[in-house]
Amino acid sequence: MAPSSHRSGVVQPLPPDAPRRAPESKTKVSGDAENEEQPLLQASEPENVHKSEIDRASSIIKRLNLLRMTRAKGLGFIVFAGLNFSFASICIKYASHRVTSHETVFWRMVIALVLNYIWARYKKRKLVVESKYRGLLLLRCVVGTVGVNLQFYAMSKMVLTDAIVIVSTSPISTFFLGAAFLKEKINQVDLLAGITSFIGVMFVTRPAFLFASDTITKQAPPLATYCAIGASLTSAVVYILLRQLSKVDCLVSIHYFFVVGTCTSIVTLLVMKVSMTILLEPIFLFALFGSGFFSFIGQIFITKGFQLEQAGIASVMRYFDVVFVVAMDVLVLGEMVSLLSLLGAGIIMAGVSMIVLRRAREQ
């Protein structure tokens, strides 16, 4: 009799001697181990994007803070350079009473060249300039040398304070030259600070068309005044060139400036038929050495300062030179400085302080 169809669904027990099938082992699909280590809730894509934006923003903030610290350091370098240049000006003024301005330029260049070469060798710097910077460096050396000669002649014939402040009018020109050639943005506050300092310069120089004649101070020769103005214009050009040479090592740039200056001063001595005079007086010898030594230190820090800061803003800090010179004019040289000169020095400091305080608030 055939089995009925409803019995086909009944499970029959296995006979005792039938082989038992081993239980299936739970094998992990590839990737399960990695999935176990992952968090239960995956971060969504917008959250990852948000994190990357935060990281990018923090990186930008760090770079901006570093840039601000670097620029603040550049301002400090320029102020310290101004202090050294004021010492050099005192030495030059004293030496000019004994020798000509051409001799003073020669000794200043030679002494500074020797000191810079020794320091460059000590720092193991190669005095080699890339070909793309040689033209700009040559122009910087020539213009700078012309400016130094004009400045030295003006300082030897004028009251030191008046000569220095006329030379220090260069920042106003530098602001506009920097905007034209370096594409530097002119900040309104910084420009206002420069104009304020320039007003202070006017109080110190007291031009005849604005001020009555001052009987206390002596009248400067017209040629000396023109030389001081020429030194101011050449300084503005040099500041722009220093910014364009920011990739050149400062010791290398200074070295060739002193080389060109030394060669030019030798040619000037020969053409002008100046007989060299060396007085063996300790104070005079110190003045000659100091004119080179302090100029060397000042050139290092002013070059580094202009490589770090915008040309227009950095040049305004050169107004601090006037404050140093006014103090040394009275204390060291004993020259008469009018109350208007002191008022002008105060106005200059006010203009410079506007820039310094802005930099401090950025930190």
Which residue stretches match the model-derived regions?
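Membrane-interface interhelical linkers
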Residues: A2-L83, H97, L113-L139, A212-A220, ...
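Juxtamembrane helix-loop-helix junctions in multi-pass membrane proteins
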Residues: L83-A112, V237-V260
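Helix-helix packing/entry segments at the starts of transmembrane helices
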Residues: W107, A163-T169, V248-V260, F296-V330
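Loop-to-transmembrane alpha-helix entry segments
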Residues: V167, K183-F203, P207, A224, ...
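Cytoplasmic-side transmembrane-helix entry/capping segments in multi-pass membrane proteins
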Residues: G74-F80, S131-V142, I186-I199, P221-Y226, ...
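Hydrophobic/small/kink-forming positions within alpha-helical transmembrane segments
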Residues: G82-S86, I90, Y117, C141-N149, ...
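C-terminal-most transmembrane helix of multi-pass membrane proteins
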Residues: A2-P13, D55, Y319-Q363
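Transmembrane alpha-helical segments that form core, pore/gating elements
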Residues: A212-V274
